[in-house]
Swiss-Prot record:
Its cofactor is Mg(2+). It catalyses: UDP-N-acetyl-alpha-D-muramoyl-L-alanyl-gamma-D-glutamyl-L-lysyl-D-alanyl-D-alanine + di-trans,octa-cis-undecaprenyl phosphate = Mur2Ac(oyl-L-Ala-gamma-D-Glu-L-Lys-D-Ala-D-Ala)-di-trans,octa-cis-undecaprenyl diphosphate + UMP. GO terms for biological process: cell division; cell wall organization; peptidoglycan biosynthetic process; regulation of cell shape. Catalyzes the initial step of the lipid cycle reactions in the biosynthesis of the cell wall peptidoglycan: transfers peptidoglycan precursor phospho-MurNAc-pentapeptide from UDP-MurNAc-pentapeptide onto the lipid carrier undecaprenyl phosphate, yielding undecaprenyl-pyrophosphoryl-MurNAc-pentapeptide, known as lipid I. This is Phospho-N-acetylmuramoyl-pentapeptide-transferase. The chain crosses the membrane at residues 1-21, 53-73, 77-97, 110-130, 145-165, 174-194, 200-220, 226-248, 301-321. Pathway: Cell wall biogenesis; peptidoglycan biosynthesis. GO terms for cellular component: plasma membrane. It comes from the Bacteria. The keyword Cell cycle applies. Belongs to the glycosyltransferase 4 family. MraY subfamily.
């Protein structure tokens, strides 16, 4: 596949988001609809209250449009392409519902935890059923141990993987530009892996995500003019997990998505420590807030986290290809 196709995919996603995002921002500002900031969050985040959210709506549309037209042009609209777009839309719709409730109620509480979990599980179950129908391998590739056939247990693993990483990306989305940058690195890494495996349809999807997120980053870096919302973070997390599954390099996501893993682990450790000992390990979790409390700027945290994520992604890609 030529560099022309790579470039067309990246540029298409970028231009759609870059050109249309100002209109979406103006729409939300005109309606005075913006993100409500959690009271228990860092006090200096209160100035972000009212910033338009649900920017994920536009980059999801850009990803879909780009994947469809480039995939159609290159005859790469295969079943796995539709699976990826389905997960992106379903998890995005769940986040849209959550964000809409927050905007309507003018508070930072949307769907109840069980409602969000139910939606995530339903989406994951549908993915596993389609996966099984396509006779894709129900096996897990474990570095150093080879490929392990899990049979029906692979479906349970896939469900946990999708739900876990969609929530992990959602937890990480607490600083301007952090998730947009890290997700760009992760999807870029999987684009390279997909290319090496001749899975060009998955590669095109990943490149569409990268281009769209770069367009979004123009408006999401500090100081953010718009947030991606749960709509964006849940969709990205679900799609990222689905990509790792369809490329049969599931566990590589632990390294390629190491920042999402660290952020989630910090929350789990914080809660467990407080429940067991009454003491907190971090000044605040997720861990990016801990560094904020230590006096780090958002830009410094972003750059350090992106650097860690980039190094981890390069190592992972190098060991796979």
């Amino acid at each position: 596949m030529s560099l022309l196709v790579w470039g067309a995919t990246l540029i298409s996603g970028f231009i759609i988001v870059f050109a249309l995002m100002p209109s979406l921002i103006r729409y939300f500002r005109a309606r005075k609809e913006g993100q409500m900031i959690r009271e228990e969050g860092p006090k200096w985040h209160e100035k972000k209250s009212g910033t338009p959210t649900m920017g994920g709506l536009l980059f999801i549309i850009a990803i879909l449009v780009t994947t469809l037209w480039v995939g159609g042009w290159q005859h790469q609209l295969q079943p796995t392409t539709w699976i990826l777009m389905f997960i992106l839309v379903l998890y995005g719709a769940l986040g849209f519902w959550d964000d809409s409730i927050k905007l309507w109620r003018k508070q930072n509480e949307g769907l109840k935890a069980w409602q969000k979990l139910l939606g995530q599980v339903i989406g994951a179950v549908i993915l596993t059923l389609v996966y099984q129908h396509e006779h894709l391998p129900m096996a897990l590739r474990i570095p150093g141990l080879g490929v392990w056939s899990l049979g029906i247990w692979y479906m349970l693993f896939a469900i946990i993987w999708l739900v876990g990483f969609s929530n992990a990306v959602n937890l990480t989305d607490g600083l301007d530009g952090l998730v947009a940058g890290q997700a760009t690195i992760a999807f870029g890494a999987y684009a390279v892996i997909a290319y090496a495996q001749n899975q060009y349809n998955v590669m095109l999807f990943c490149l569409a995500v990268v281009g769209s997120l770069l367009g979004f980053f123009v408006y999401n870096h500090k100081p953010a003019k718009i947030f991606m919302g749960d709509m964006g973070s849940l969709a990205l997390g679900g799609a990222l997990a689905a990509v790792s599954i369809l490329l049969h390099h599931e566990l590589s996501l632990l390294l390629i998505g190491i920042i999402f893993v660290i952020e989630t682990a910090s929350v789990i450790l914080q809660v467990a420590s407080f429940k067991l000992t009454g003491k907190r390990i971090f000044l605040m979790s997720p861990i990016h807030h801990h560094f904020e409390m230590k006096g780090w700027s958002e830009w410094k945290i972003d750059i350090v986290f992106w650097s860690i994520g980039l190094v981890a992604a390069v190592i992972s890609v190098a060991t796979i290809i």
